[in-house]
């Protein structure tokens, strides 16, 4: 075979290969152009992404988290020894004072009891209109001295909903015992359930020995109680209107009395009888219900060792804040209630006048990125945060609305991916500013790993990029 023939054959082969390459490049360019969304993650990929975010951005996935920016130290006059204030929409801690001091929760313990009960209702194991048997351990006459009571007695007919009302409004220790024995048969077994709730939420200082809050051996901190309350409100928001915001409760009524009993006045000066027949109306122990704008929960607590405690929440214009104050001062209940009113008002009014919620949902979502020189044609970059509400400080404008209108959101991310992509690679960010002040910078990370393509695909993709 002569030299010219070899050259012609070689040229033909090269031309054919070049034509094939051009055709491949054209087809790939067309495919990439029309590729507008990434393939859904499979279960393993979803698990890997979740694991990565939890490991590398763990603070963003805690129940409570610090502000993403600094503010001047607030000049608040909080009387309680320990306190915390959070935005329930995102768990942001707006204010704290000795929030990690371990203190008995007293009757705030009952919130954990209510949580366990609500979980049983949600699971279909109990219903609100269900009649609950009252063991002797739950009768008012068998409660420890100075217990708060809803006045349960032998033979009474009481529904689950009435017990929850008695627990939340009257802070009835007898109601706490009745619920514990109904659900688990013994106080010890019910307390195990409560402690498991605390453990599941990562509350390391929260521990219970009984369900009413009477014992000083029950322990928690303001921070951990706030974290629990946030979860409680997220999972059972109806409990606020159904129980915690109700201003008064009368028990027992005619329909609650034991067979043969009739409504009649009684003298309790010598102790409580087994059969209680006198209706007693009690007001909600929370002194800010119906007093401070927006307040609709949650729970007071007092024993000598704890001082005057209060878990408080209020909602105005769609924004909800929650405070926990513990070891409040007071030589008597009147002084203790005055302290609760003072601290609750101080914290809530400061929160509503100093912050507002800004919804970032229209920005905090996955963004599609085309991939060149990779095994797949694209992937998503996702925000490394779970919350879509930002607590915004009031720093500019004559009104909070004007303040919010000055927020600017900047999206900054790569145009295209190239070659190997690793799960979690930072590919950009979302920057939220107010009046030139950065409030939050959210990393945008790759939601999956992609292998690098072979040399021919890389060459084709390089040409496609050059011609864009």
Which positions does each model-derived feature cover?
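N-terminal Sec-pathway targeting helices
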Residues: 1-18
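Active-site-adjacent loops and short helices of periplasmic peptidoglycan-processing enzymes
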Residues: 3, 29-235
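General helical structural elements
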Residues: 7-12, 32, 37, 303
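Intrinsic disorder/low-complexity segments
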Residues: 12, 81, 199, 259, ...
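Hydrophobic alpha-helical segments and their boundary regions
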Residues: 12-15, 80, 102, 144, ...
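Hydrophobic alpha-helical membrane-insertion segments, chiefly the h-region
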Residues: 17-28
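Domain-terminus/edge residues, biased toward the C-terminal soluble/receptor-binding domains
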Residues: 29, 203-204, 216-220, 224-468
């Amino acid at each position: 075979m002569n030299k010219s023939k070899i050259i012609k054959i070689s040229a033909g082969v090269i031309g054919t290969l070049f034509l094939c390459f051009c055709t491949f490049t054209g087809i790939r360019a067309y495919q990439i152009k029309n590729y507008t969304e990434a393939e859904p993650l499979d279960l393993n990929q979803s698990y890997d992404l979740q694991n990565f975010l939890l490991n590398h951005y763990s603070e963003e996935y805690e129940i409570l988290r610090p502000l993403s920016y600094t503010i001047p130290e607030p000049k608040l006059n909080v009387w309680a020894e320990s306190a915390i204030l959070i935005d329930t929409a995102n768990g942001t801690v707006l204010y704290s004072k000795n929030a990690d001091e371990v203190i008995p929760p007293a009757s705030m313990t009952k919130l954990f009891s209510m949580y366990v009960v609500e979980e049983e209702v949600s699971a279909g194991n109990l219903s609100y209109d269900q009649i609950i048997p009252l063991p002797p351990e739950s009768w008012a006459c068998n409660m420890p001295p100075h217990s708060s009571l809803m006045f349960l007695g032998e033979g009474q007919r009481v529904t689950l909903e009435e017990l929850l009302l008695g627990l939340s409004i009257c802070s009835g220790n007898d109601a706490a015992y009745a619920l514990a024995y109904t659900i688990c048969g013994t106080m010890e077994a019910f307390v195990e359930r409560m402690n498991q709730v605390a453990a599941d939420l990562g509350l390391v200082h929260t521990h219970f020995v009984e369900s009413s809050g009477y014992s000083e051996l029950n322990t928690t901190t303001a921070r951990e109680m706030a974290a629990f309350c946030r979860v409680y409100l997220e999972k059972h928001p109806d409990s606020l209107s159904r129980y915690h915001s109700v201003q008064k409760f009368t028990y027992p009524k005619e329909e609650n009395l034991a067979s043969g009993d009739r409504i009649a006045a009684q003298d309790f000066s010598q102790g409580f009888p087994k059969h209680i027949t006198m209706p007693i109306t009690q007001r909600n122990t929370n002194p800010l219900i119906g007093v401070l704008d927006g307040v609709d929960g949650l729970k007071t607590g007092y024993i000598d060792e704890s001082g005057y405690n209060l878990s408080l929440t209020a909602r105005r214009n769609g924004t909800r804040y929650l405070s926990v104050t513990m070891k409040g001062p007071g030589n008597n209940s009147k002084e203790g209630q005055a302290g609760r009113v003072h601290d609750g008002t101080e914290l809530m009014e400061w929160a509503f006048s100093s912050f507002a919620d800004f919804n970032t949902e229209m920005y905090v979502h996955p963004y599609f990125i085309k991939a060149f020189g990779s095994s797949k044609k694209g992937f998503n970059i996702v925000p490394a945060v779970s919350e879509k509400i930002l607590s915004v400080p009031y720093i500019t404008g004559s009104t909070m609305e004007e303040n919010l209108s000055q927020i600017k959101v900047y999206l900054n991310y790569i145009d295209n991916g190239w070659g190997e992509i690793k799960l979690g690679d930072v590919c950009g960010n979302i920057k939220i500013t107010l009046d030139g002040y950065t409030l939050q910078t959210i990393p945008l990370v790759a939601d999956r790993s992609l292998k690098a393509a072979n040399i021919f695909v890389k060459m084709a993709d390089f040409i496609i990029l050059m011609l864009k």
